[in-house]
C-alpha cells in the first residue's frame, strides 16, 4: 500500500487531448512521456490519468471494456510502462482513475452475464420487469432517461446509473469484489 501525503499536487491528464507523441493526430502516452520534465517543473508531485483502459468510447473512456490493459490508441502497455518509469525517475507518482461502479456493455463480464454464464450471471444488477411491462423501479439515470434497460438476450432489465452502455456492477456479489481486488493488485 502507498499512503500519499495530502499536500501533494497532481496534474490530471486525459491523454487524448494532451500531446500527440506518435504523430497520428491524437494525444497519447508517448506525448505524456515527452512532457514529464515540464510537468515536474510546474511543481507537480505526480500525474493522475483519466481512464486510459480499452473502451468503446461511449463516455470518454469511463465505459471500461478491460481493466487490465491500456488502450492501443494511447500506446498500450509499453507506453504506460515508459511513462511510469519516467515518472518514478523524476520522483513523481502516478494515479490511475479506476471506475468500478460500472463497466462497458462490451466488457467480457457483461457479455457473459447477459448469457447467464457462471460465475458471471450475477456480476451486474439484473431485475425482471413489473407486471404490464413496467420497469423494476422509477429511478432515473444521471445521464439519460431511466436507469433500466431491457436486454433481449437475458430477458431482464439491467441497471445503469450512468449511460445505457455502462451497466452497473453488482458490488453485493463477493465474486465481483474479488475481481476488483484482482484489478487493484494488477496495477
Question: Model-flagged regions — what are they?
Answer:
Residues 3-181, 185:
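Acidic/aromatic-lined carbohydrate-recognition and catalytic surfaces
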Amino acid at each position: 500500500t502507498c499512503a500519499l501525503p495530502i499536500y501533494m499536487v497532481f496534474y490530471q491528464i486525459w491523454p487524448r487531448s494532451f500531446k500527440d507523441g506518435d504523430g497520428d493526430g491524437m494525444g497519447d502516452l508517448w506525448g505524456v512521456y515527452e512532457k514529464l520534465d515540464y510537468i515536474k517543473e510546474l511543481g507537480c508531485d505526480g500525474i493522475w490519468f483519466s481512464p486510459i483502459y480499452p473502451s468503446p468510447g461511449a463516455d470518454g473512456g469511463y465505459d471500461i471494456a478491460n481493466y487490465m490493459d491500456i488502450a492501443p490508441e494511447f500506446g498500450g502497455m509499453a507506453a504506460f510502462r515508459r511513462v511510469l518509469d519516467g515518472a518514478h525517475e523524476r520522483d513523481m507518482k502516478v494515479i490511475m482513475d479506476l471506475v468500478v461502479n460500472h463497466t462497458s456493455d462490451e466488457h467480457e463480464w457483461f457479455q457473459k452475464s447477459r448469457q447467464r454464464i457462471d460465475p458471471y450471471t450475477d456480476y451486474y444488477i439484473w431485475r425482471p420487469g413489473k407486471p404490464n411491462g413496467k420497469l423494476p423501479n422509477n429511478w432515473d439515470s444521471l445521464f439519460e432517461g431511466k436507469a433500466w434497460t431491457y436486454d433481449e438476450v437475458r430477458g431482464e432489465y439491467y441497471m445503469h446509473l450512468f449511460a445505457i452502455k455502462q451497466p452497473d456492477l453488482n458490488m453485493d456479489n463477493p465474486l465481483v469484489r474479488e475481481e476488483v481486488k484482482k484489478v487493484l493488485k494488477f496495477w
